[in-house]
């Protein structure tokens, strides 16, 4: 149970000064102490990466597991009647050391997975899975928890009541009420899924790195900016110099670099490398056997728990409640989207035929290129024209941080004295308007071979008043870093990603909860993306935009005409962005609405994907899923199984919240304080629909503004 609680972070993420030092920290004979097992002496109790060695993690996990086992044994050996204090609270506190070690280690497995970290992960995961099964199916422990839930729940108040409910239902959903035979099978399923997810997590980054496209001459890169060409050269050097240049593949199906790449054959190679990265085209990189087995085990798990499918089992704890409601929501969007997507594709192809001839057939690897040319012609704008105004440092300090200062009264001070796990990382002390420190924030914005694709937020330490712990939060992105001495310039999409991930960070940093289990982003998947998507809205608010969108050389604000054209371009041909998300969402649901007998073999999985998309009217080579089955890390390696819809679902919530802010004052600190008090600070201490209603006054979300906000 604590295993699940620890790792369901975003993306997935304190002062430890009052956290008790583990009894396992001391080493005999005055030998070096494992820094993961002793209280950090750094400000805020931050993890001391200058002292932590890769060899420290495995013994630290072993000590944390041993300590939690001992604490669980104390709970079940207690002869006194079960109470909130001696059972629920004791369980909440049973894994403090393990939480601390896990939060640091799993930050590295995603953002800086060196061979040493990868090897440690192989050894750690089976230990954690065994512990999770051991605790989840400990009948003596569950009997005590159930007794408190049955006899004390209605007498408890506030967070004590909520914590009791969350812990009890967590055990039930893990299978604590199953028969002994079904419990044993559930343990086997959990263990195998954990092993398979680790395999997927190792194979996919390797497949993505293997899928790079090598380029022999600079001429082949025609259309790219000097900075992009320099990045291709730098990437080639870091990946072995098999050719003078290379194009790395990012985590999504479409590749942004195709926007400017003139060489059609090279565009085709890049696109094909992306979609075939892990489907067995190269026999060493085939995730189909892994994902089909995970899908089958999840389907069996859902049925063991009394549900027809895994989707219904998983969705019960969300705002959506079941697969039927999600499918109805998606169909309402598809109905509006489909004709616009067809018209958009015809429009782009007709434009391309003007220069390429009437027989030219638009291919998926052409779409970004001709759409960009069309946008430049119609709006007279391109990424190369606007990127000089988006220096990553200015976006962070004068945009992301400035918006948080204006709306929530937060201040940020860089702490160069606090060590990090990589030189690219920065650390900031966050304080409120009174000057009181409330959090540490780490940013790690640049891609490297040891980092998986995408962007995410998580925590080195979650907030907890009961543990005397302030939050230590981090954001990770994958922006291409400029050569030494040059400023890193990013695209508008990357600007929005920084605002998005910082929305998650605010959810973690502004948390004010008693219990670790309930704090920060520990909310339903179809609510957790709301604060992040809402925070994106600040990127284009004039007072914020003008503050960070400054020319990297002159410091001049973006000219009004360019700004107007850029903002108009945000929703230029918007069907693609919605379509790729709809397709990925429906693909996720299709896999998790199958019964065990319906799961296709690895050899038929590709055909199943096409059939699933065709069934909902989304089989469209021009608008492929944002992630296809073989590289859908959110679903097979992360916590979004049957939950990828939450990005669209929460976008509806975010539009409603943004509309409320716009109506009452987008940068009004009073409105920001209300949002902080009623939503961001509350964690999972209250039903999320109630939080939404408390802030907006709406009884339920209104989807009418969603398509309008999307430009559709």
What kind of feature is each model-predicted range?
Residues 16, 20, 66, 70, ...:
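Intrinsically disordered or highly flexible coil/loop and linker segments, enriched in small
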Residues 29-51, 63, 222, 244-246, ...:
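C-terminal, non-catalytic "cap/extension" segments appended to globular domains
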Residues 1-29:
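Bacterial Sec-dependent N-terminal signal peptides
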Residues 27-232, 661:
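N-terminal helix-rich structural modules
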Residues 163, 195, 202, 207-248, ...:
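Active-site-proximal, well-structured secondary-structure segments within enzyme catalytic domains
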Residues 41-56, 105-124, 146-188, 248-289, ...:
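Short His/Asp/Glu-rich catalytic/ion-coordination signatures at enzyme active sites or charged loops
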Residues 480-499:
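Short pre-active-site segment immediately N-terminal to the catalytic Zn-binding motif
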């Amino acid at each position: 149970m604590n295993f699940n609680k620890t790792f369901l972070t975003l993306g997935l993420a304190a002062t430890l000064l009052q956290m008790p030092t583990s009894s396992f920290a001391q080493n005999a004979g005055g030998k070096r102490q494992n820094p993961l097992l002793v209280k950090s002496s750094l400000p805020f109790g931050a993890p001391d990466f200058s002292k932590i060695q890769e060899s420290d993690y495995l013994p630290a996990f072993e000590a944390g597991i041993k300590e939690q086992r001992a604490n669980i044994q104390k709970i079940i050996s207690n002869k006194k009647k079960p109470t909130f204090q001696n059972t629920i609270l004791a369980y909440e506190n049973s894994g403090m050391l393990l939480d601390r070690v896990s939060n640091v280690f799993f930050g590295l497995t995603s953002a800086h997975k060196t061979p040493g970290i990868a090897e440690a992960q192989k050894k750690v995961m089976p230990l954690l899975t065994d512990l999770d099964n051991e605790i989840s199916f400990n009948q003596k422990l569950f009997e005590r928890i159930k007794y408190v839930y049955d006899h004390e729940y209605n007498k408890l108040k506030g967070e004590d009541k909520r914590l009791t409910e969350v812990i009890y239902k967590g055990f039930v959903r893990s299978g604590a009420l199953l028969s002994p035979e079904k419990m044993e099978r559930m343990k086997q399923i959990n263990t195998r899924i954990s092993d398979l997810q680790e395999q997927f997590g190792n194979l996919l980054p390797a497949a993505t790195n293997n899928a790079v496209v090598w380029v022999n001459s600079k001429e082949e890169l025609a259309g790219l900016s000097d900075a992009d060409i320099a990045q291709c050269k730098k990437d080639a050097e870091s990946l072995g110099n098999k050719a003078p240049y290379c194009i790395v593949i990012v985590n999504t199906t479409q590749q942004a670099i195709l926007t400017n790449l003139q060489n059609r054959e090279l565009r085709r190679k890049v696109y094909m490398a992306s979609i075939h990265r892990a489907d067995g085209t190269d026999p060493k990189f085939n995730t189909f056997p892994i994902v089909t087995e995970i899908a089958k085990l999840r389907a069996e798990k859902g049925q063991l728990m009394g549900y027809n499918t895994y989707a219904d089992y998983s969705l019960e704890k969300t705002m959506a409640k079941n697969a039927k409601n999600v499918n109805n929501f998606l169909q309402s969007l598809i109905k509006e989207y489909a004709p616009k997507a067809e018209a958009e594709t015809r429009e782009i192809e007709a434009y391309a035929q003007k220069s390429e001839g009437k027989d030219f057939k638009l291919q998926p690897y052409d779409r970004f290129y001709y759409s960009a040319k069309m946008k430049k012609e119609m709006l007279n704008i391109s990424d190369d024209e606007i990127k000089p105004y988006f220096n990553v440092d200015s976006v962070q300090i004068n945009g992301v941080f400035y918006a948080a200062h204006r709306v929530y009264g937060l201040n940020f001070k860089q702490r160069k004295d606090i060590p990090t796990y990589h030189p690219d990382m920065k650390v900031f002390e966050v304080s409120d308007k009174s000057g009181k420190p409330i959090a540490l924030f780490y940013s790690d914005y640049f891609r490297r071979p040891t980092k998986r694709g995408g962007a995410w937020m998580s925590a080195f330490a979650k907030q907890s008043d009961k543990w005397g712990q302030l939050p230590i939060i981090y954001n990770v992105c994958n922006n291409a870093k400029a050569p030494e001495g040059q400023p890193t310039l990013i695209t508008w999409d990357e600007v929005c990603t920084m605002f998005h991930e910082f929305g998650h960070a605010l959810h973690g940093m502004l948390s004010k909860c008693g219990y670790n289990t309930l704090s920060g982003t520990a909310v339903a998947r179809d609510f957790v993306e709301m604060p992040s998507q809402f925070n994106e809205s600040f990127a284009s608010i004039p007072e914020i935009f003008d503050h960070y969108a400054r020319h990297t050389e002159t410091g001049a604000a973006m000219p009004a005409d360019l700004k107007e054209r850029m903002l108009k371009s945000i929703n230029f041909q918007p069907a693609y962005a919605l379509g790729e998300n709809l397709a990925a969402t429906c693909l996720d649901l299709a896999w998790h609405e199958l019964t065990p007998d319906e799961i296709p073999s690895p050899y038929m999985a590709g055909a199943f994907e096409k059939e699933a998309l065709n069934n909902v009217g989304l089989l469209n080579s021009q608008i492929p899923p944002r992630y296809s089955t073989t590289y859908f890390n959110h679903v097979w390696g992360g916590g979004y199984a049957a939950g990828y819809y939450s990005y669209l679902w929460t976008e509806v919530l975010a539009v409603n919240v943004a509309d409320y802010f716009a109506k009452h004052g987008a940068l009004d600190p009073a409105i920001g304080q209300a949002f902080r008090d009623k939503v961001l600070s509350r964690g999972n201490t209250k039903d999320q629909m109630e939080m939404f209603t408390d802030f907006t006054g709406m009884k339920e979300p209104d989807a009418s503004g969603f398509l309008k906000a999307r430009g559709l």
